[in-house]
Amino acid sequence: MPGYSLGIKELDDHLGRIREGTNLMMIGPPMSRKDELLDAILSHNLGADDGVVIVSTREPGERVLEWFTEQGIDISGSNIGIVDCVTRTLGMNAPDTARIKRASSPVDLTGIGVKISQFLEEFLVKKNLGKIRLSINSLSTILMYSNLQTVFRFLHVFTGRVKAANGFGIYVVEDEMHDAQTIATLKQLFDGMIEIKSIGDSYAMRVVGMTSKPTEWFEYDIIGSEIILNKPKKP
């Protein structure tokens, strides 16, 4: 089936299939479980014809793969590639593996770009996979080390490659960490947004820019790879 889905019934019913070549920003406050939300979306309906490339600036590649294993996904038979920007910043000289390629740090955009390109070549050219998903978690970490113009150029390249490959990209941004101009500049690269906000002791999400009107806000919980939505209670 052409296109992609989020694996969240209420949102997928509203959005329909997400067209190939789409890039989305996921933006929300700290501690809103964006990492888990992102991984759950990426893991939805992974098949033999699906490739996933995850740039991790928060945790080592082994921990990312461990999450997928915990969800019952056979890593050895999957097409999952992790660009690990963490391990070598901790002074650990861990080697690359078939599923994990190490960048020296989140500031090493050239190295990160090379590793992403290696996985894209493996999945799209050598294996000729039909679908590719790319995520960067998070852009905010990268922006701590590089200026906006440099990050914009880097993103322009890879959002363009996602479009050219008929893929699906999701890129995480921490709300409240950046000024309005930074967010406005980054938004130019994306087709829409997954917005997250706090509601009391919980968090709610909606999708903006993919249809004529934003979706409704839904509170969410995450159990493993399952995302459970509920409409916020009215005061």
Placement of each model-derived feature along the sequence:
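Glycine-rich P-loop/Walker A and Walker A-like loops and their local beta1-loop-alpha1 context
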Residues: 3-66
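Nucleotide-state-sensitive switch-loop elements of NTP-binding domains
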Residues: 58, 65-106
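Conserved beta-strand segments of the P-loop GTPase G domain that flank and frequently precede/overlap
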Residues: 25-29, 54-56, 83-84, 135, ...
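Substrate-engagement module of ASCE P-loop NTPases
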Residues: 150-177
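Phosphate-binding/switch loop-helix module in NTP-utilizing enzymes
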Residues: 89-157
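Loop/turn-to-beta-strand initiation segments
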Residues: 51, 79, 130-133, 164-172
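Phosphate-binding/switch region of NTP-binding enzymes
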Residues: 167-168, 172-235
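Conserved nucleotide-binding/hydrolysis micro-motifs of P-loop NTPases
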Residues: 31-32, 58-62, 87-90, 139-141, ...
